[in-house]
Every structure is written in structure tokens, then in C-alpha cells.
């Protein structure tokens, strides 16, 4: 099903903050489904694109996950040390180059392949970030470094080896509550036989 391209005209834009992310306020006109022009004011966070990857070891039927501190989660009162798939910002790299770099930095695994699965907007109502999702079949021999993140980026990342079925249970019991991680684990559960 194809969607008509939005008919939008930006009337004005104002930068509200320009730190790690940029926050802008927009006044816009758009033509709705009935053909009427609507004037709206919206704020948008301009966020660098990112990539994430599920590292799956079919011989041991496990996934490589990471645990790291997330301030935004802490601010909401949830456990701040989140269990996630390896991920990172593109930093002007192609998504596959970026995720290969991030997998090595965070987990110490050298990827023989990185298969692109899909891309999505995790919060399209207010954030421009697009995330590219990948999967890679790995083996214990592919771990060529310790991982754990980069000292100069003050990363403190724990590398976890989790059986896939246990990871599914961790979603059910609330231990894993990161959206990109849940999406990739559910994809792996649906496609496990194709990965073996």
C-alpha cells in the first residue's frame, strides 16, 4: 500500500537547543486528507541516524547482548543498567560500517557478515532518528577483543552471552525493555531456523 507524500510547507523554524541533539520548533502548513490546510506548531529533535545488530551464535543458540547505563531511563525511575543489543550512531559512516565498528567496540566480536534486515523510526512523532537493524551469525572464535566500549567515550559496557530462549523470557519478565532489542530478539525467535 503506497501512501501519498505529505503536502507540507515549513512557515518558520527556530532552534531551541543545539547540544548533543538539536531541538527545533516549527510552524508549518499541511494539507490534510480532506484537502484543508492546517497550521500547526511542532517541536522536533534532530537525532543522528543509528544502527543496531543482533549477534547470534547458532551452535550455542545464544545471543550476545550488552548492559550499560542509560540516564534517560534512570530519570524515569526504571533500572538504568539496560540490557540491549549492540548499537551506535552512524557518525557519517554507512550503516553497515557503523554497526561493524560498534559491535567490535562494545562486544569484541569481528563480524564475518552483517545482514541488513530493516529500518524504522523509533519515535516518529518528535524525533528524526532512523535506526538500521542488522543480524550477524557469529561463533566464539569471532571474539577477537574484550569489548566493553571505549574509555575515551566513558563507556562502561558489560558483555553478556544469553541463550535465545532465556532472552525471550527476559522480555516477558521485564528484564529486557529496550525496543530495538525486543524487536531483534522477536525477529530471531521467528527466524531461528533460517539462522542455523
What are these regions (language model features)?
Residues 27-34, 123-145:
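Active-site-adjacent beta-strand/loop module that shapes the phosphate/pyrophosphate-binding cleft
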Residues 110, 115, 121-123:
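Acidic/glycine-rich phosphate/pyrophosphate-binding loops and surrounding catalytic core
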Residues 31-32, 57-60, 69, 137-141, ...:
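Short loop segments at secondary-structure junctions
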Residues 92-97, 106, 110-112:
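Beta-rich strand-turn-strand
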Residues 55, 65, 135-136, 161:
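Conserved hydrophobic "DFG−1" position in protein kinase catalytic cores
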Residues 16-60, 74:
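Acidic, metal-coordinating catalytic segment for phosphate/diphosphate chemistry
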Residues 2-12, 67, 77-83, 116, ...:
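Nudix hydrolase/Nudix homology domain
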Residues 42-45, 54, 62-101, 143, ...:
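Conserved Nudix-box catalytic region and its N-terminal flanking loop in Nudix hydrolases
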Amino acid at each position: 500500500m503506497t501512501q501519498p507524500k505529505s503536502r507540507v510547507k515549513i512557515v518558520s523554524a527556530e532552534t531551541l537547543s543545539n547540544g548533543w541533539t538539536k531541538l527545533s520548533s516549527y510552524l508549518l502548513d499541511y494539507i490534510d486528507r480532506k484537502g484543508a490546510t492546517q497550521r500547526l506548531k511542532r517541536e522536533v529533535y534532530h537525532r543522528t541516524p543509528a544502527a543496531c545488530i543482533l549477534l547470534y551464535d547458532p551452535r550455542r543458540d545464544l545471543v550476545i547482548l550488552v548492559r550499560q547505563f542509560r540516564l534517560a531511563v534512570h530519570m524515569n525511575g526504571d533500572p538504568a543498567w539496560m540490557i540491549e543489543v549492540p548499537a551506535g550512531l552512524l557518525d557519517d559512516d554507512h550503516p553497515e560500517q557503523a554497526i561493524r565498528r560498534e559491535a567490535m567496540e562494545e562486544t569484541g566480536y569481528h563480524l564475518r557478515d552483517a545482514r541488513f534486515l530493516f529500518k524504522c523510526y523509533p519515535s516518529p512523532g518528535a524525533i528524526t532518528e532512523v535506526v538500521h537493524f542488522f543480524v550477524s551469525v557469529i561463533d566464539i572464535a569471532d571474539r577477537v577483543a574484550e569489548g566493553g566500549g571505549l574509555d575515551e567515550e566513558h563507556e562502561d559496557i558489560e558483555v553478556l552471552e544469553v541463550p535465545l530462549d532465556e532472552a525471550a523470557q527476559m522480555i516477558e519478565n521485564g528484564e529486557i525493555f529496550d525496543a530495538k532489542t525486543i524487536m531483534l530478539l522477536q525477529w530471531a525467535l521467528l527466524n531461528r531456523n533460517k539462522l542455523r
